[in-house]
Amino acid sequence: VFSAVDAVVLPGVGALGTAMANLRRINGVQQVQELVQRGERPVLGICVGHQMFFEQGTERDETVDGLGCLPGTVVPMATPRLPHMGWNTVHPPADTALFTGISGERFYFVHSCAVVTVSPESAHAMTGRNGHPVRTTTTCHDGCTFVSAVECGQLCSTQFHPEKSGPAGIQLLRNWLAMI
C-alpha cells in the first residue's frame, strides 16, 4: 500500500495502543518501519502519530510496542495539570529543516503522555533506527521537559498539532511538504 505514495502522515488524537492496533489491523506496521528505514519518502507523525515512532509506550497501565524507529519510551507526564492542552513554546535546534523560518513561536498541544527527557542535551544525542541523527525539539509543561518534535532523515514528527497552530503550524507543514 505505502509503496505507491509520495509521503505518509500518521495523524491522531487518542491512545497509542489503539493507534498501533489500527495500524496492525491494516498490516501497516512493517510497511511504515521499512519506509522509514529506507528513507525514500517523507513521513510525518502528529500527536499520537508522533508517539507511534518510539520504541514503547505506557498508557492507562498498558505497555504497548511502538514502531521502534526512534529510541525512547512514551509515558504519562508527571505534572499536576493533565492533559497538557493549549499553547506552548517549542525549542528547536537552530538547523532543522522542519522549523526553517520559525523562531520563538507557540504551538497547540493536547496530550497526557510524551517522551520525557532528563535533559535537553541528552535528547539531542540520539540516533534513529535509520542511522540518521535524531534532531529533537523540546518543550516544558509544568516542570516536565519532553520531546515535542523530531527530525530524523525523512522522518519528522510533532507532539503538537501543526494544523491547529496558526501561521507557525502552516509554515511547519509547508516546510515538511517541501521535503516531498
Language-model-detected regions and their locations in the chain:
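A short, aliphatic-rich alpha-helical micro-motif
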Residues: 2-3
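Cysteine-nucleophile active-site neighborhood
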Residues: 7, 13-86
